[in-house]
Amino acid sequence: MSVCTGALILAQLRLLDGLKSTTHHECLDLLRELAPATEVMPDARFIDNGRIITAAGISAGIDCSLHVVERLLGSDAATKTARYMEYQRS
């Protein structure tokens, strides 16, 4: 899982080739340049490709992290985690 510009590192390692991805809105063009074989999704808060997940920015990373909690532990665990954090999920 990458958050914000962490996707640029994944791009340089060619781990995003053939996948959809996102990053911070100010780095979308750089992501396209570094990973021409990825489909950049500029309006997505996060993209879950199964084994690789990319999140657009810091607050999107919170939504993405709660998504991972939900994927691994279920919806109830993600809801309880968000409530504990006093975070309103997108």
Each model region followed by its residue ranges:
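Active-site-adjacent pocket-lining segments in enzyme domains
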Residues: 1-90
